[in-house]
Design a protein with these regions (language model features):
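Domain-scale signature associated with acetyltransferase and cell-envelope carbohydrate enzymes
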Residues: 1-137, 162-168, 175, 185, ...
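Short, flexible, mixed-charge acidic loops at enzyme active sites
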Residues: 141-151
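Active-site nucleotide-sugar/metal-binding loop of Leloir-type enzymes
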Residues: 197
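A short, flexible loop at the N-terminus of ABC-type nucleotide-binding domains that lies
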Residues: 179-180
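A generic "structured core" feature
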Residues: 184, 188-190, 194
Length: 217
């Protein structure tokens, strides 16, 4: 990666960290009502400084301590909230793997959610996630175990395919959604599930690996 990439990444994170420091100071110094207003100001400050760096950015909000990698390959619609401590990465490793992330309108990305793309991740409208959710279209290393003698950081990045999440989906805490998965509209995924296969619309899924346990329509 070029020196320009590292400079831009440093500047992006510096802006976000400044907003984070402002938010933390408000919690220490002021009472609850003032803190809420200060949090809103912090989000507005971070969003205002960051939004021009994205491929497309609607009328949405970024909270403090959010880490973006290559936001020029990330699109976010209107009315979406990226909550504290999220990591959203669009990796560019080669011509074969050039990550892109598209997040729709009116989504709420819960705290500590990690979205990482080396291929493409598409999220529809009105997504709600809990905390500590992982959405990934890639992994380190081959599934046949032929590269286990290499350090994980040096193994080839592999993607089984794009991740596509439909509209009005609810993803509970600590769910992992793996590469090559398509999730339909109106799906509910129970906490701690690992999604490795497609899920049809209007169902409740749970487990490791996640299975449909109820259909709503």
């Amino acid at each position: 990666m070029s020196i320009d990439y590292y400079i831009k990444h440093f500047v992006d994170n510096f802006i976000i960290r400044c907003g984070t420091i402002l938010g933390i100071c408000s919690q220490v110094i002021f009472d609850y009502r003032i803190t809420i207003r200060f949090e809103a100001f912090t989000c507005a400050f971070i969003t205002g400084r960051m939004k021009k760096r994205f491929k497309c950015f609607g009328k949405s909000k970024i909270c403090r301590s959010v880490d973006f990698v290559n936001p020029q390959y990330i699109s976010i619609g209107d009315g979406t909230l990226i909550q504290n401590h999220c990591i959203i990465e669009a990796w560019v490793f080669s011509k074969s793997y050039k990550g892109e992330i598209i997040i729709g309108n009116n989504c709420a990305i819960g705290e500590y959610t990690h979205i990482t793309a080396a291929n493409r991740i598409t999220i529809g409208n009105n997504l709600q996630t809990g905390r500590f959710v992982l959405i990934t279209d890639n992994s380190h290393g081959k599934t046949d175990g032929s590269d286990l003698d290499e350090a994980p950081s040096k193994r080839e990045i592999i993607s089984k395919g794009e991740v596509c999440i439909g509209n009005n989906v609810w993803i509970a805490d600590k769910v992992s959604i793996m590469s090559g998965v398509k999730i339909g509209n109106g799906v509910i995924i129970a906490a701690n599930s690992v999604v490795t296969h497609d899920l049809p619309s209007y169902c409740l899924a749970a487990g490791t690996p996640a299975k449909v346990i109820r259909y709503f329509k």
